């Protein structure tokens, strides 16, 4: 299992040169272990019929969100005075809230809701539960998502947005599973790359529970 964190040069690559061994957050062994787990006394949790173990701490999430915000500011906010952030409900609400506070510049925020998950599995079909009401025509759009897994939902969303003639669309996702991706799309800003395991917390749910957790947990098989 390997997880990558955002570096200043590339949003999808971890730079080992940025810190010495004691400061590294990620291990390069088979199992990913956030170092702060040992300090925060994070414990396993139980949600309905599943057990989840600690994966990424709230402190590590906060640092990654700041780095994503800096990249968006440099790439978009410095060049476009009126970008539109489209927040995908329900999962991205915590990531979007922290990300937009870090950006701290005037911008328009709108919300959409699509669904392709039942329990721990993607259904392969996408339902539009709440459409976008903001004007997209000729504008820079930044989609804020909790996770890009197979890409099924994101592919459907991009097709939906392109019909409204945006200037261009960028994707900012808290989590990205490159090994699971089935579509030709680019995640422009990803705080973390993770393997295919099912996770919960920080907005992500298992059967609508666990969104309120400040840390991220992975299913304990």
Protein language model regions, located:
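PRPP-associated nucleotide enzymes
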Residues: 1, 18, 27, 34-221
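Polybasic, lysine-rich low-complexity intrinsically disordered segments
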Residues: 3, 10, 21-25, 31
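Leucine-biased recognition of intrinsically disordered, low-complexity hydrophobic segments
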Residues: 6, 12-13, 35
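Juxtamembrane/membrane-water interface recognition
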Residues: 13-19
């Amino acid at each position: 299992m390997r997880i990558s964190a955002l570096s200043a040069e590339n949003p999808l690559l971890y730079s080992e040169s940025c810190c010495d061994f004691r400061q590294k957050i990620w291990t390069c062994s088979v199992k990913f272990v956030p170092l702060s787990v040992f300090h925060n006394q994070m414990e396993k949790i139980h949600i309905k019929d599943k057990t989840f173990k600690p994966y990424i701490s709230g402190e590590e999430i906060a640092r990654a969100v700041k780095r994503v915000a800096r990249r968006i500011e440099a790439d978009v906010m410095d060049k476009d005075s009126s970008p539109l952030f489209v927040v995908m409900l329900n999962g991205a609400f915590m990531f979007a809230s922290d990300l937009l506070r870090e950006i701290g510049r005037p911008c328009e925020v709108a919300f959409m809701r699509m669904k392709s998950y039942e329990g721990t599995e993607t259904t392969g079909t996408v339902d539009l539960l709440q459409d976008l009401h903001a004007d997209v025509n000729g504008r820079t759009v930044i989609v804020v998502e909790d996770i890009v897994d197979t890409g099924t939902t994101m592919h459907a969303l991009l097709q939906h947005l392109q019909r409204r003639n945006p200037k261009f669309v960028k994707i900012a996702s808290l989590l990205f599973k490159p090994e699971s991706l089935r579509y030709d799309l680019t995640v422009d800003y990803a705080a973390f790359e993770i393997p295919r395991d099912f996770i919960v917390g920080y907005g992500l749910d298992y059967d609508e529970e666990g969104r309120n957790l400040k840390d991220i947990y992975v299913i304990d098989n």
